């Protein structure tokens, strides 16, 4: 008969093996989900390739970019002349020639091209080669101002109409729209002008009938779709343009749209059978890095200033901030540390924004500290760094903002500082957006990831097929020598649920910061739970555990709306009940070693602190 100790030993062995199997099952389930998503993407890609092949075989081959890459069209000579003599360029970038030719042939087209790929040229050049004018719809007045400044420097006649335009200016533009001898080639308006101005629509109709309106360009076309990252209701009214003016060519442009968003936007704009040209998302010269944001604001600013005055000394850059207030404060702090910085945000006077933009373009300012209002349409080629003072509200925004670096195809760095508190500041801002929280969590997941190639993560988001080996160690994760393991954090998640339930029983709500304080045995004693030990981990690690639990839906956000602010609280999430199952395990990827072993892609890829020691750029311990 077996002894009790022997049976106990075997029981422990079986329990241990079952626990290991549970972890493997969870990992396999997660992998299955990833593979099913990738299978769906690949199936759609194969279907599209088969449709393209069938179209080519039937002679209907104008859907392929290759059909538009020739230089023997009737307009090719004029196109080449304008490219060289007006835009001062010797050659086209990928897909520019194809898009210009399709537009000149009066085809409707959607162009998906990375930030910095040269989308604006694809409608500006055809406008100069046509007899009439092209109407350009842009979401931001600041974007239109930036575009006009560049066009004026090139000697191109362009203007804009907005709510602040004087009656005299509006009257002058309306006259030019009908003048066959006018040199006006581009008229920029916001979508509100189309949706709400009957007078302007009447003028457009007369211009169309007179053969003066030759094209429409819808910039940031993803704004049409409620599934896009920056949905704007007035964009939905733009379908009237193709219905009223069927013979014009319409081009929709974006750097950040998934296939689902593109299809939705095409339907809204009444161009469901348009051509779609998609450039590769990859910018091989950009180095992507995520860093933990220092807890001290003073240390953080000093950290950024050391980078700018050291590695990036004399080099041009952009710093993106969460709010207008942040951008102003960061600018002042950097100026005190010897950085030639200027602020840029939408609430500034137009002449002040233009002044900052002009000074930065002329390298009189080294850095622009800005909100998202800055950058769309910016064509400064030698931006060597884009620093995010806080993360973007979505992967689409981050891809677009970081893409303003390195347009000259030389190496540039994209450094994102990721902080726990930023998640909930941004969440409170996007909660009213249709998919705002979902897109924010995708961004957070990107920041939390400590092992997967950054380009692979971006590719996965945009439904691209990507081989991580092609990164060429141009991201922080691909530069790491660290090995990783799955750490069981089930007990930590159970502790969080107990604290939240105790608060709920007291009819109290906990903000993320109060939850951490209660977990660490700080703050109000009423939130501390008997039997929940204070974890022997630094606060930074506890923050990452909470974020992981939030992303995995063991926790969820709840909001309280006041007259002055939207406040984020944490509550028990929909998957929390699983934590009471004995076999259920929550795991999180961590470094196997506590020592940093970051191998830089270049000598510049590691930050050097004030004492000359290399700091790790790893996000999670």
Swiss-Prot record:
Protein family per UniProt: Belongs to the helicase family. RecQ subfamily.
Keyword Coiled coil tagged: no
Chain positions recorded as ATP binding sites: 113-120
Name listed for the protein in its UniProt record: ATP-dependent DNA helicase Q1
Molecular function terms from GO: 3'-5' DNA helicase activity; ATP binding; ATP hydrolysis activity; DNA helicase activity; DNA/DNA annealing activity; double-stranded DNA helicase activity; four-way junction helicase activity; metal ion binding
Residues annotated for Zn(2+) binding in this entry: 453, 471, 475, 478
Cross-referenced SUPFAM superfamilies: P-loop containing nucleoside triphosphate hydrolases
Function: DNA helicase that plays a role in DNA damage repair and genome stability. Exhibits a magnesium- and ATP-dependent DNA-helicase activity that unwinds single- and double-stranded DNA in a 3'-5' direction. Plays a role in restoring regressed replication forks. Required to restart stalled replication forks induced by abortive topoisomerase 1 and 2 lesions. May play a role in the repair of DNA that is damaged by ultraviolet light or other mutagens.
Catalytically driven reaction(s): Couples ATP hydrolysis with the unwinding of duplex DNA by translocating in the 3'-5' direction; ATP + H2O = ADP + phosphate + H(+); dATP + H2O = dADP + phosphate + H(+)
Pfam family, one: Helicase_C
Domain Helicase ATP-binding, chain residue ranges per copy: 100-275
Subunit annotation: May form homodimers or higher order oligomers. Interacts with EXO1. Interacts with MLH1. Interacts with PARP1.
Annotated InterPro entries: DEAD/DEAH_box_helicase_dom, DNA_helicase_ATP-dep_RecQ, Helicase_ATP-bd, Helicase_C-like, P-loop_NTPase, RecQ_Zn-bd, RQC_domain, WH-like_DNA-bd_sf
Locations listed in the record: Nucleus
Positions carrying N6-acetyllysine: 514, 522
Superkingdom, taxonomy of origin: Eukaryota
GO terms classed as biological process: DNA replication; double-strand break repair via homologous recombination; replication fork processing
Motif (DEVH box): 219-222
Cellular component terms per the entry's GO annotation: chromosome; cytoplasm; nucleus
Domain Helicase C-terminal intervals: 296-451
Residues carrying Phosphoserine: 597, 602
Enzyme type, top EC level: isomerase
Keyword ATP-binding: yes
Entry keywords, A to Z: Acetylation, ATP-binding, DNA-binding, Helicase, Hydrolase, Isomerase, Metal-binding, Nucleotide-binding, Nucleus, Phosphoprotein, Zinc
Cofactor(s) the protein needs: Mg(2+); Mn(2+); Zn(2+)
């Amino acid at each position: 008969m077996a002894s009790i100790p022997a049976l106990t030993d075997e029981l422990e062995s079986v329990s241990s093996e079952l626990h290991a199997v549970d972890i493997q099952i969870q990992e396999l389930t997660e992998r299955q989900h990833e593979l099913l998503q990738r299978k769906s993407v690949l199936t759609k890609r194969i279907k599209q390739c088969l449709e393209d092949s069938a179209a080519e075989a039937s002679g209907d081959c104008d859907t392929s970019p290759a059909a538009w890459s020739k230089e023997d069209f009737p307009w090719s000579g004029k196109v080449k002349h304008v490219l060289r003599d007006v835009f001062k360029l010797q050659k086209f970038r990928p897909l520019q020639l194809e898009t210009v030719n399709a537009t000149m042939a009066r085809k409707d087209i959607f162009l998906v091209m990375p930030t910095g790929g040269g989308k604006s040229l694809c409608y500006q050049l055809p406008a100069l080669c046509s007899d009439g004018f092209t109407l350009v719809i842009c979401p931001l007045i600041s974007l239109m101002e930036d575009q006009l400044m560049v066009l004026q420097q090139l000697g191109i006649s362009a203007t804009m109409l907005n709510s602040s335009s004087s009656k005299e200016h509006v009257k002058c533009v309306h006259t030019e729209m009908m003048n066959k001898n006018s040199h006006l080639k581009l008229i920029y308006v916001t979508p509100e002008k189309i949706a709400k101005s009957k007078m302007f629509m009447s003028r457009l109709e007369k211009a169309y009938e007179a053969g003066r309106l030759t094209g429409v360009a819808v910039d940031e076309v993803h704004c049409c779709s409620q599934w896009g990252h920056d949905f704007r209701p007035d964009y939905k009214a733009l379908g009237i343009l193709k219905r009223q003016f069927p013979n014009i060519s319409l081009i929709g442009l974006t750097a950040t749209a998934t296939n689902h968003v593109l299809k939705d936007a095409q339907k809204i704009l009444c161009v469901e059978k348009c051509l779609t040209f998609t450039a590769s998302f990859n910018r091989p010269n950009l180095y992507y890095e995520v860093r933990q944001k220092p807890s001290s604001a003073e240390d953080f600013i000093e950290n950024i200033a050391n980078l700018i005055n050291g590695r990036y000394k004399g080099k041009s850059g952009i710093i993106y901030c969460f709010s207008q207030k942040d951008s102003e404060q960061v600018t002042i702090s950097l100026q005190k540390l010897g950085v030639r910085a200027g602020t840029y945000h939408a609430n500034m006077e137009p002449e002040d924004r233009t002044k900052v933009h002009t000074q930065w373009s002329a390298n009189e300012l080294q850095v622009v500290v800005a909100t998202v209002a800055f950058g769309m349409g910016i064509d400064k080629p030698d931006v060597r760094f884009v620093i995010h003072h806080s993360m973007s509200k979505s992967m689409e925004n981050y891809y677009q903002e970081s893409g303003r670096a390195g347009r000259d195809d030389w190496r540039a760095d994209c450094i994102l500082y990721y902080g726990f508190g930023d998640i909930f500041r941004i969440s409170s801002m996007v909660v009213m957006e249709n998919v705002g929280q979902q897109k924010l969590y995708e961004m957070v997941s990107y920041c939390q990831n400590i092992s997967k190639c950054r380009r692979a993560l971006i590719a996965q988001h945009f439904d691209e097929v990507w081989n991580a080996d092609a990164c060429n160690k141009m991201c922080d994760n691909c530069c790491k020598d660290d090995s990783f393991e799955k750490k069981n954090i089930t007990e930590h998640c159970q502790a969080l649920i107990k604290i939240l339930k105790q608060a709920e029983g007291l009819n109290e709500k906990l903000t993320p910061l109060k939850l951490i304080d209660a977990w660490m045995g700080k703050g109000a004693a009423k939130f501390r739970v008997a039997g929940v030990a204070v974890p022997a981990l630094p606060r930074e690690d506890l923050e990452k555990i909470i974020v992981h639990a939030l992303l995995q839906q063991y926790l969820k956000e709840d909001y309280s709306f006041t007259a002055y602010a939207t406040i984020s609280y944490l509550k028990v999430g929909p998957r929390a009940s699983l934590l009471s199952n004995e076999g259920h395990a929550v795991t999180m990827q961590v470094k196997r070693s506590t020592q940093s072993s970051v191998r830089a892609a270049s000598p510049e890829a590691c930050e050097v602190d004030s004492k000359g020691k290399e700091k790790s750029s790893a996000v999670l311990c």
